[in-house]
Amino acid sequence: MGDIYQLLKPKKGYAYTKEQIIDASLVNLPIPTGKKLKGNSRVIGDVDEETFKIIVDTIISLCSRFNLEYQEMAYTLLICLAESGFNPDAAAGTTSASGLAQYTRSTADAFKARSKSILGFEIDMSGTNVFDANIGCYGVLVAFLFNKNLALKWGFKPNDDKYWQLIYMLHHDGPGYYEDDRGKERALRFKWRKDAIDTYERVFKKNLLLLTALLKQKVETKLKLTDHEGKAIENKNYIIATVKSPDRKKPTHLSMNRNEKKEINVVFGKTNSNGESSPVHSRIGDEIITLLLP
């Protein structure tokens, strides 16, 4: 079936011409050279492989932490692919849309309240914070959760193809507008801009089920211990614990739902000469708890 990174690997888009760029656009802001996670330019998909993979991994981790199902996790990743091509410094020329989820200036300014409502804590996305990769990953997650909640509120169900299409349509056309009755009326009519429909067909409909299947695969994971100088720590005793029979619909967590009975795999060992543990096989996003012993 291939590889998650291979499926999500973005293609570099095209730069805006001078005539296309409006005053509200952030496309001409210089990218700080000292940023750890940054794009090569403001163009969609113009990001190096290391940054791309870190952003994919961060979004997966956040989706797991907030208990999303694998199909929802796949959808959240595809939002980032469609909007910015995983370039945290991407910016539109024809609007003020910027960052990983392409929030406009107004929706970025409103993000502090929205993150508090949905995630339980405030995140400031205003100004150039919209280009911060970690903040942007939260922005992608909230984009999915906010519009998912609207779709459910308006009577759409996950077993309906329109439910999945609606989530991206709402984000693409600006989620703030759709909280009122005008948005609900338009959602029920299900008439959207052609570019939004084309993107949904090309990115989401084509890849959602395949990416979901890839995320459900078991992968090999190793613990690697190093000191502050990056040197391997050998012969360190450890315990690694995972859930024995993970949920097939979503990542499994040992630290959540503690009243539920769970079978646990426990591995005892010592790190090898490379500072590595024995391999552990688990589904992507599953929680792995590690204890280091004297």
Residue map of PLM features:
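Non-catalytic cell-wall polysaccharide-engagement segments
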Residues: 2-53, 58-62, 66, 106-219
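Short, functionally critical alpha-helical segments immediately adjacent to catalytic or ligand/cofactor-binding
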Residues: 69-87, 140, 167-173
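Conserved alpha-helical segments that form or flank metal/cofactor-binding pockets of metalloenzymes
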Residues: 83-98, 102, 106, 111-112
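A short, amphipathic beta-strand motif
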Residues: 219-229
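Short, ordered, surface-exposed loop/turn motifs in non-cytosolic proteins
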Residues: 229-256
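Short Pro-Gly-centered beta-turn/loop motif in secreted/extracellular proteins
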Residues: 231, 278-289
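Short, acidic Ser/Thr/Gly-rich low-complexity loop/linker segments typical of extracellular
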Residues: 247-276
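A short, solvent-exposed loop/turn motif at the edges and junctions
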Residues: 291-294
